């Protein structure tokens, strides 16, 4: 058996802050905001997303803080976090495949070019419907369902259908859930 660490389909590497390659704790004071960064990538062209998960001194997980790509195409992600009580905090970076992010990137390219428009919009409607299922009933749930219904509505112009899926309201719901 090898003692080489297993790297999954979405590696998370070079997580910082780290002192002495993670052998010693990084330090901050209560209320001090600091940035956690990591290299997050995957093979192929599918999008990824990542969160920083803080664990407080009592062992409670959260809050989950969404990370953002620091420089497009760099695979370097970051998020600012703030410990709110004294004690030994830990953090980890979680990463996953982002099918909605992948669809949004592809749709922004293919739909204006007239490539596979019907299929792309149908896939988007299905993805947004699935995403809505993970959002509690209420206004945010309704935002995603409305976007899904508009994407699926063949009676509307293609540009209108796509635009409904890319609004700031939809962005906000997707970022939160």
Q: What is each residue range found by the language model?
A:
Residues 3-6, 10, 18-21, 28-83, ...:
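Catalytic cores of nucleotide-enabled group-transfer and carboxylate-activating enzymes in metabolic
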Residues 1-43, 106-135:
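Non-catalytic, glycine-rich low-complexity segments
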Residues 30-34, 170-177:
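Basic K/R-rich, polyanion-interacting modules in nucleoproteins and related proteins
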Residues 66-123, 127-174:
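Extended acidic/polar, glycine-enriched regions
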């Amino acid at each position: 058996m090898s003692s080489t660490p297993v790297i999954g389909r979405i590696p998370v590497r070079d997580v910082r802050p780290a002192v002495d390659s993670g052998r010693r704790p990084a330090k901050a004071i209560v209320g001090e905001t600091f940035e956690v960064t990591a290299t997050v990538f995957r093979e192929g062209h599918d999008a990824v997303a990542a969160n920083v998960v803080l664990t407080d001194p009592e062992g409670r997980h959260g809050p989950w803080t969404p990370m953002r790509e620091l420089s497009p195409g760099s695979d370097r992600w970051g998020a600012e976090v703030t410990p709110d009580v004294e004690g030994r905090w830990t953090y980890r970076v979680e990463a996953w495949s982002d099918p909605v992010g992948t669809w949004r990137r592809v749709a922004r390219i293919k739909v204006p070019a007239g490539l596979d428009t019907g299929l792309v919009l149908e896939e988007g409607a299905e993805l947004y419907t699935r995403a809505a299922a993970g959002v509690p009933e209420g206004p945010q749930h309704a935002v995603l369902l409305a976007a899904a219904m508009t994407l699926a509505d063949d009676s509307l112009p293609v540009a209108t259908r796509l635009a409904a899926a890319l609004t700031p309201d939809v962005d906000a719901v997707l970022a939160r859930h």
